[in-house]
Amino acid sequence: MEGRAWKFGDDVDTDAVIPGRYLIFNTPGELAKYTFEGVRPDFAKKVHENDIVVAGSNFGCGSSREHAPLALKGSKVSCVIAKSFARIFFRNAINIGVPVLECPNTDRIDDGDELEVDLSTGDIQNITKGETYQATPLPDFVREIVDEGGLIEYARKLVSER
């Protein structure tokens, strides 16, 4: 996957991803209109399909709502790369079908850098800077869940194959 980096700092909580007043919505497309509204008001209008959210430590902390990864899925970002994730956000993102990668080098990535990401190897190419970073690759079964669009879709596939 290849896209432009949208850079955020440490401790980006789920309220920053999708403000609480929009929790009345529950579809990815509707939530996408308000993604990062309080911290990057231009995000929803300027994000492009396959762009990549990059952050520091503890991304997705705070409330354990599924709305945050749903909003990111609706925004059509290809993945989220961070130094670390709040555990429940990490699980929710996988269950929703949003790839998440932990990488210790997110400080080297700047807003607007063009990145190429290989989920199977964890390789991140910063095309803008000519650098390569190593993220922790997702295990095969987790990639299968993400590739199917989330846990529910993955379970449906398993049932239909029986």
UniProtKB/Swiss-Prot annotation:
GO terms for biological process: L-leucine biosynthetic process. Pathway: Amino-acid biosynthesis; L-leucine biosynthesis; L-leucine from 3-methyl-2-oxobutanoate: step 2/4. The keyword Transcription regulation does not apply. Keywords: Amino-acid biosynthesis, Branched-chain amino acid biosynthesis, Leucine biosynthesis, Lyase. It comes from the Archaea. It catalyses: (2R,3S)-3-isopropylmalate = (2S)-2-isopropylmalate. Pfam families: Aconitase_C. It is an enzyme of class 4 (lyase). One of its GO terms (molecular function) is 3-isopropylmalate dehydratase activity. Its EC number is 4.2.1.33. NCBIfam families: LEUD_arch. Catalyzes the isomerization between 2-isopropylmalate and 3-isopropylmalate, via the formation of 2-isopropylmaleate. Belongs to the LeuD family. LeuD type 2 subfamily. Heterodimer of LeuC and LeuD. This is 3-isopropylmalate dehydratase small subunit. The gene is leuD.
